[in-house]
Amino acid sequence: MSVSDKVEYYKIVKDILKSDEFQKRKTYKHHGDITVYDHSLAVSKLAYKWAKKLNRDYKAAAIGGLLHDFYFEPWQENQEKKPLLQKHGFVHAKEAVVNSYQYFPELMNKKIENIILRHMFPLNKIPPKYIEGWLVTLADKQVSLEVIKEPTALFQFFGYKRKKHLEAK
């Protein structure tokens, strides 16, 4: 990103980055060793960059990318057994929308809501409505997969503590 793009990007997201609530995500693990804060920042920057290049709404891409995982409880710490459709991958986008409106109502609109709500496609059946939503969805997948450096890391990516099927019998 150019210096002018970095300055512009920061102006768009500074209120989120300075928020005490968003800062807590520095302590939440995402996948592998990356935190939710670092993951969300990487997704946001990548979606912003792509949106600028494609002459799309880069502000919505930056904000939606930053808030797409704005949930309260690190999913790895929740040991509660839940039906499949109530697990983190299916519900955290709705929680992120609610939290985003609660903490950043002045930044939210229907486009950003849709970006956040639909970023888990195809896990969630309804795709993003806007190009910017697709950019955040794809950036999220790319950034998430970058943590997988070896095949066994794939199991930790999905929250499995042990790799039973890989252990010697």
Where do the protein language model's features map onto the residues?
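Metal-dependent phosphohydrolase cores
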Residues: 1-169
